[in-house]
Swiss-Prot record:
Origin species: Rhizorhabdus wittichii (strain DSM 6014 / CCUG 31198 / JCM 15750 / NBRC 105917 / EY 4224 / RW1) (Sphingomonas wittichii)
Top-level lineage group: Bacteria
Keyword list, A-Z: Ribonucleoprotein, Ribosomal protein, RNA-binding, rRNA-binding, tRNA-binding
Gene3D superfamilies named in the record: 3.30.1440.10
Record-given protein name: Large ribosomal subunit protein uL5
Gene name in the database record: rplE
Subunit text: Part of the 50S ribosomal subunit; part of the 5S rRNA/L5/L18/L25 subcomplex. Contacts the 5S rRNA and the P site tRNA. Forms a bridge to the 30S subunit in the 70S ribosome.
Amino acid sequence: MADAYTPRFRKLYDETIVKAMTEKFGYKNHMEVPKITKIVLNMGVGEATQDKKKVEQAALEMTKIAGQKAVITKAKKSIAQFKLREGMPIGAKVTLRRERMYEFLDRFVTIALPRVRDFRGLNPKSFDGRGNYATGLKEQLIFPEISYDSVDKIRGMDVIVATTAKTDDEARELLRLFGFPFPADNEDQKQAA
């Protein structure tokens, strides 16, 4: 029987990241080492109140990007100022876990982020205090699955990475070892001067 397929970033985690994190933080057990539990992609579509097809197009793009069917999100309550009624479709989201999560992470770090215009690294302060990281993207065209001709409107999206890390420092180190391009601390001090 052939060996089961293991994503490249899963192998990276098992073979190198666990050792590096154990050395740096002094974990006594390899099960203490933080890991990524899920990645949530979320795209809000503001124009959806006028045109329902915009949400379907956004969900189709999210499905292509994630490799998993997107769920259309609906408004929880009515807001008159936005002409929004409870239950109206207003966006799309995808929750990735296990192999698909590692595959997306690989494509996000190695292919998509380098294609962002004027990219100077991810914001190292976007952690929530519990070891989770959130970042926003201004356009969906940075993913190779989306062709420029098929896009009706450039939309941004949120990428949320949930980890089992107890502190932001542990999560920052985990994501840095996965290849997330955080600017170095000494560069931040140079810019402040």
